[in-house]
Amino acid sequence: MRALYPGSFDPLTLGHLDLIERGCALFGEVVVAVLSNPAKTSTFTLQQRFNQIHVATAHCKGVSVICFEGLTVSCARHNQVDLILRGLRAMSDFEYELQIAHTNRSLAPDFETIFLATAAHHSFLSSSMVKEVARFGGNIDHMVPEVVAQDLHRLFN
């Protein structure tokens, strides 16, 4: 099976990476789809985020990284995946993700969304929180892959 894991990944956290690894173990293949959203201001460019994920997942058999703009279900169809993978850290994530899953299902009834609970030791992580810690000089080495930590240190130091 092939799973699509879409997101902005600005930046990729160890929580994201854990979900990618677990997705590979469960489904065999994970297509990490990096969202280009012109309406959002990103810390890292689309190419930087693509490169960070490519480097951070080099050890994962069955992972491919792509960039996309537009609807997730269009990306899923175009890349011939079987399901959409999403992570849940808390109940607040569930409410938001459930709305998106229902919307995707209304647009493309043939795609299921599978939710995986984030590992407890990563449940506090968010990309925005990581950037905040990095911006003020805090240690982020236990929050993000090494390639991302290096890029954040360069950006904020």
Swiss-Prot record:
The enzyme class is transferase
What keywords appear on the UniProt entry? ATP-binding, Coenzyme A biosynthesis, Cytoplasm, Magnesium, Nucleotide-binding, Nucleotidyltransferase, Transferase
Binding residues annotated for substrate, in chain numbering? 8, 40, 72, 86
Which superkingdom does the taxonomy of this entry point to? Bacteria
Cofactor dependence is on: Mg(2+)
Q: Name one GO molecular function term.
A: ATP binding
- A Gene Ontology cellular-component term: cytoplasm
Its function, per the record, reads: Reversibly transfers an adenylyl group from ATP to 4'-phosphopantetheine, yielding dephospho-CoA (dPCoA) and pyrophosphate.
Name of the protein described by the UniProt record: Phosphopantetheine adenylyltransferase
Q: From what organism does this protein derive?
A: Prochlorococcus marinus (strain MIT 9313)
